Regions:
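Catalytic cores of RNA-modifying enzymes
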Residues: 1-169, 173, 215
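C-terminal lobe and adjacent flexible extensions of AdoMet/dcAdoMet transferase-like proteins
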Residues: 154, 171-225
Length: 225
């Protein structure tokens, strides 16, 4: 029903979104860009927000689900993805352009150098598809890095109910020392005695799938109860 474009600038993408049957809103931190959009796109009347997307409360604005789209600022790429995770119940999908390295990390699979905290946490809530790479020479002035466009489609994994805080803690701690086996990497978390001989303890965080982390979290929680 709703689409929110983050960081529309002068509306290069906005004009195409406004041709669609969905209701398009924009969030832009730059006041001059908002004034430009208001002047050139009448359909955006009362559908624009001046401010930081990271601080916007989506529930205050949208009565239903809202898809997110944007050419996102590279300096807050990870924060935008974490904001989407936090609001997964209201955000069924996202299509966005990020710095290529961030896009690749988000879509990465186990046993690869790009697989890490971002990969696991995003993929616990969304299916991730790397769509295409955007080269520097299509921008003016060209940036120093390539860009990548990814799509997130909500598909929250089973087993997270009531375990989300512990799940995130295990993932972040495990990857905090990614070259160490989990038996060492997770020492600071007071590992339950029954799990100290668990098969996963002999592996590194990068070897575990998203489902492995969720199952391990469930076993950890059960051992503590």
């Amino acid at each position: 029903q709703y689409v929110l474009e983050v960081g529309p600038g002068t509306g290069v993408l906005t004009k195409y979104l406004l041709e669609k049957p969905t209701e398009t809103y924009v969030a832009e931190i730059d006041t001059e860009s908002i004034e430009y959009l208001k002047l050139h796109y009448q359909k955006l009347e009362n559908k624009h927000f001046t401010g930081d997307f990271l601080k916007i409360n989506l529930n205050d604005i949208f009565s239903g689900e809202v898809a997110i789209i944007g050419n996102f600022p590279y300096n807050i790429s990870s924060q935008i993805l974490f904001k989407i995770i936090e609001n997964y119940q209201q955000i069924p999908e996202m299509v966005g352009m990020f710095q290529k390295e961030v896009a690749e990390r988000t879509a990465a699979v186990p046993r690869t150098k790009d697989y890490g905290i971002l990969s696991v946490l995003v993929q616990a809530y969304y299916d991730v598809k790397y769509l295409f790479t955007v080269h520097e020479n299509v921008f003016n002035p060209p940036p120093k890095v390539k860009s990548g466009v990814i799509k997130l489609t909500r598909n929250r994994k089973e087993g997270l109910e009531g375990n989300e805080i512990l799940f995130k803690q295990i993932v972040k701690t495990g990857f905090g020392q990614r070259r160490k086996k989990l038996s060492n990497a997770l020492k600071s978390l007071d590992i339950p005695e029954v799990l100290k001989s668990h098969a996963f303890m002999d592996k590194r965080a990068e070897e575990l799938s998203v489902e492995d982390f969720i199952n391990f979290t469930q076993e950890w929680k059960a051992a503590k109860n």
